Amino acid sequence: MAENKWKERNDLQQKRAISAEVARLSGLFAGLDSKKAEVVEGLIREVAFMRIQLEELKVKLLSEGFMITMPQGKYEIQVESPYSRAYATMIQRYTTAIGKLMELLPKEVAGMVDDGFDDFVDSR
């Protein structure tokens, strides 16, 4: 997938990519209780959409650059690309949303390491 990851996708490919990302993220939250699952479901869809859109914006930025040249009368000026602005805004929102999702992940209970102490006490 790394080869075509940076190519533009058509609408159907985008929908499939979003669905795949939703499935991937949903798998991480499979053990959630039903109340949290309802909250997480919508957030997962939004995060999946943002991730795919960020990839699309990245394709545009890699091909067109972060700056564009605009004619201003007799001279030209360099201004920030609209894709650059959109990417910067969306990456902040994506980071916030993914952080919220990570907070909702079930906490893994650290397994107790058997150090043999219980066996020692039981044997006395």
What is the role of each PLM region?
Residues 1-83, 120-124:
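Extended, surface-exposed interaction regions
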Residues 12-19, 23, 91, 95, ...:
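Low-complexity, intrinsically disordered regions enriched in charged/polar residues
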